[in-house]
Regions:
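Gly/Ala-rich beta-loop-alpha elbow adjacent to hydrolase catalytic centers
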Residues: 1-9
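Short, hydrophobic alpha-helix immediately C-terminal to the catalytic nucleophile
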Residues: 10-14, 166
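Flexible "cap/lid" loop of the alpha/beta hydrolase fold
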Residues: 14-52
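Conserved alpha/beta-hydrolase catalytic His-Asp/Glu region
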Residues: 34-35, 55-112
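Short beta-strand/loop motif that positions the catalytic acidic residue
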Residues: 114, 120-122
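Conserved alpha/beta-hydrolase "acid-adjacent" motif
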Residues: 127-133
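Catalytic histidine-centered segment of alpha/beta-hydrolase-like enzymes
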Residues: 149-163
């Protein structure tokens, strides 16, 4: 699971209801361990940031430069026109719900006992943004292998370089199969 999908995967692993032999958490978001009021302020920041990017092409392109975040062979203008139109379809309520649920989901105090091989990936360019998540995952799932991906930002590997993502995933899955 990548980003918010990583939050879903983290919860699935913690509950241990579905057997999972190996898991890749790619830049997964972990729940804030902060007071309610602080989490509400962070939610306001996230909603404001999203709305600014959705309503300003300049801000969107400053946050996600087209030359970096457009898949090879695709037209950046068409891609960003489509993204801009898509981002404007989100209601305020949806934006709030997405950010609140991704950052504040409930986990048991201790995860279920699972034998899952877990790796947590993050882009080296997002390392500072993921410090809290990495620390949480290391503590919560001590068996996790942490792996920085060189010269990548958040979700860049899977979105812009899917073939490279597949090579990393295949390497992890093959390595795990050999450890049995």
């Amino acid at each position: 699971g990548c980003s918010m999908g990583g939050a879903c995967l983290t919860r699935m692993l913690a509950l241990g209801k579905i057997p999972i032999s190996r898991a890749i958490i790619d830049g997964g978001i972990t729940p804030y361990q902060l007071p309610f009021l602080v989490r509400k302020l962070l939610l306001a920041r996230d909603v404001l940031s999203f709305k600014m990017a959705a309503n300003s092409r300049k801000i969107l392109e400053a946050a996600f430069p087209p030359e970096r975040f457009t898949t090879a062979g695709h037209d950046p203008k068409k891609e960003y026109d489509a993204m801009e139109a898509y981002l404007k379809t989100f209601s305020d309520r949806t934006i709030r719900n997405v950010f609140w649920s991704a950052n504040n989901y409930a986990l048991p105090k201790r995860p279920a006992k699972i034998g899952t091989k877990i790796t947590y990936w993050y882009g080296d360019d997002e390392k500072n943004d993921r410090k809290r998540d990495i620390r949480f995952i290391r503590h919560y799932f001590p068996q996790t292998r942490i792996h920085g991906i060189p010269k990548m930002a958040h979700a860049e590997l899977v979105m812009v370089h899917p073939e490279k993502f597949c090579r990393y995933a295949e390497k992890f899955l093959t390595m795990q199969a050999e450890e049995r």
